[in-house]
Amino acid sequence: MINKLYTFFFSKGILSKINNLLLNACLRARGYNNFNNNKESGESFFIRNILAPTNPKIIFDIGANVGIYSNELLQKTDAKIYSFEPLPTQYELLKKLSVYGDRFVAENKGIGAENKTLTLHFNPTKPTHASFSEDVKKVSYIKNEMKTEVEVVTLDSYCAEKSIKIIDFIKIDVEGFEPEVFKGASEVFNKIKPKFIQIEFNWHHLFRNTSLLYFSEKLPNYDCYQLIYDGWIKRDPKDPLTNIYHFSNFVFVRH
């Protein structure tokens, strides 16, 4: 009966604005489109209540931008942070975190599927939208009309070169380039076995033909949690409601 009433009343075109408001409210309640700050996105909750109590020693921040997330990690944990940012202008700002001494390493390079030089597409007025993928230009709000050539390495080769044997947490926010990061990180995922892996999931992945289920299947020994406002909830990656192409952060936790 309730479903019939809902269909009868809310399917009316005159109520479309109300429907959209309700839909957006529901999406935000589930952890989507909460991007204004780290508390709203659930990232501060994760660092404070989940990550920090495990006393992490080594953390990788892939797609660090100017270091807002790296800075919070440095403040809330005693870990050493390796931060990767390929866009030169953002890297120069990221380097300011060098005040943390040997606890912080900034790398002006990207992480991908191969060791090679790639074209980074960007908008100087919206540097957080920079991406190695041209597909993300199909996202209506992305206007990456400029480009630069930058160095890209695999996570596997970087860890081998630096003799890194332990990684407690990897955060990946690379504007739709996450599948390539995964392709170059098989040794890290299977041998180093980080406890936590966070990825940003967004509209970009629709145009990369990638779902959250795709990432989950690459991490068979991990449970999936979606960050919500000041919290997190365990999700089933096979559920369509977990694969909505709106901004959200998911954390994979090793069994």
What kind of feature is each model-predicted range?
Residues 1-255:
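Phosphate/nucleotide-binding beta-alpha loop and adjacent structural elements of enzyme active sites
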